[in-house]
Amino acid sequence: MDGTVTLSSTPTAIPPVSALDAGKPTLPPEAPLAMPEQNLREGSLQVRHQRTSPPGIGMRRFYLIGGTFAATAVAVWVMLSVLWPDGISVLEGCLLCLFTLLFAWIAMSFASAVAGFVTVVARAGRKLGIDPEEPLPTLRSRTALLMPTYNEDPRRLLAGLQAIYESVAETGQLEHFDFFVLSDTTREHIGRAEELVYSELCDRVDGHGRIFYRRRADNAARKAGNVADWVRRFGGRYPQMLILDADSVMTGDTIVRLVAGMENNPDVGLIQTLPAVVNGQTLFARMQQFGGRVYGPIIAFGVAWWHGAESNYWGHNAIIRTHAFADHAGLPSLRGRKPFGGHVLSHDFVEAALMRRGGWAMHMVPYLQGSYEEGPPTLTDLLIRDRRWCQGNLQHAKVVSAKGLHWISRMHMLIGIGHYFTAPMWGLLMLIGIGIPLAGVGIDLAGDLPFSPARYWHGSSQGNAIWIFICTMFVLLAPKLLGYIALLLNPRELRACGGAFRAAVSILLETVLAALMAPVVMYLQSRGVFEVLAGKDSGWDAQVRDDGKLSWPALLRSYGGLTVFGLFMGAVAYAVSPALAAWMGPVIVGMALSIPVVALTSLRRTGMALRRAGIFCIPEELDPPKVLVRASELRRAAVLEPSLI
């Protein structure tokens, strides 16, 4: 007998297995755990100051908010000096309001990045007794690794899980772990393929009784409902659960240290890692993973520095205390119709906020490496996923006022909402920039305008206008600069990124490509916001993992309208003034060239050619961890197998 049990009955509090599972589930005996639905209109913050909160957390947050306010106040004062000489019109007043909000947005990111840079360079920020340089701790409790999936290629999915399983086994502590494949697949042929590949995996690694599989008959509430179903049925057996994504890979060493961190800190409810993006092959995927590897730590260490014990949850590559999650993270259905009503889409932010309300500490450990994920292969795939995130984040407008939330939890949600509203705000800023001269404000259309933004905005404050531009660009680009400096101070990682020169070329090329794609992102994010506000639901589709091929008809359908709009905006700007057209050139060019830029960055051969030249290299490519090598081997072997889907 291999220890595997297929359930035939359940307690009366849980529906019969036949109603819960499709196909042929292979599951352990149930250990039910109550997970009540939370009330957003009632509740109070249980613990105001956490034991594990870093010292001086109040001053850290004062620095962030005070620094943001001070920098924004100076920038607004200088902008006023540019606009004030002839009085401020209605359009200029709108411009000033937008500028204030947008500068505050980038100033806060800058202040956080500076804190992150100092933390990275000082090799500080370690917490919860989790030290990757110490000997591997011995575990005392049992942990479940959960891998939710939805219409994914099962061979690819379980290749990653096998690599994780083998890595955990190499730590010598496999007996403390069980693995669950939690399928929400709706396509019957993929479901049957999952069962076959799962059975092959168990045979291959002798995982019977340790690796389990089930497919929900009703995938209500998407991923959040998938995990909640497991918690309610099996959570009572496991003090911790580690949530993976379909493309997640983690080392056994990192997993063991996360579990030990939970065991040694009984008041901690969640520990979030910083997943490094790997395995990119297209130009777009490679520039994204390079940026995440070089700038990502600066940003992540910064937010972890001021988040303290009120960190956020990103939905995967994180370990969670099961009973804390069950007690406080049962999500209610929001009132109203979609897209704002119904099930909570971006569930991770809300679950973290509710757990913190319940008195549990939430931490992020960006210094703990060995946590990986994959990025979308093309800008189109990123924007499809981003549209779903847009709806989920805007839906938080119904949650942010919930009773008893910690103010930092509310701030997380407001930042998430603001992330999507900045896109239409930048667009409005650009349109007002053309609207002011068209309205005859502060410009002589018949006059000779030299190339000077200050002459465009009133001739008397040229120095201040240029100063605003330089400062804005510096604040925008500072995280990249700080990331490069931190890389220079780490010789080992610098070599792995191709050396100082190639890393600098990579950063420059990434900045240029990102600038060209920024108008595309701005346009489509703005459209996404308006679609959500108009009541259009995003749906739920499986993600593209590998192939970055895009057909020209698909590109024309997706970006043809944006190309025409960019050409039209360029013509209008040139009609107003060649100087204005030149000043708006980066935005206009990005829109007008959206089709070739997206096509170029979607090519695998372009990305791999740059890799051979040492551009966009990351340490995980020069010296890949064993778990990534193994996952890649298994996925390559899976490609050679007959297709099951």
UniProtKB/Swiss-Prot annotation:
InterPro entries: Glucans_biosynth_gluTrFase_H, Glyco_trans_2-like, Glycosyltr_2/OpgH_subfam, Nucleotide-diphossugar_trans. Its main location: membrane. Residues 1-22 are annotated as: Disordered. One of its GO terms (cellular component) is plasma membrane. Residues 1-12 have a biased composition (Polar residues). It comes from the Bacteria. It is a multi-pass membrane protein. It is an enzyme of class 2 (transferase). Keywords: Cell inner membrane, Cell membrane, Glycosyltransferase, Membrane, Transferase, Transmembrane, Transmembrane helix. Pathway: Glycan metabolism; osmoregulated periplasmic glucan (OPG) biosynthesis. Involved in the biosynthesis of osmoregulated periplasmic glucans (OPGs). This is Glucans biosynthesis glucosyltransferase H. It comes from Xanthomonas oryzae pv. oryzae (strain MAFF 311018). The gene is opgH.
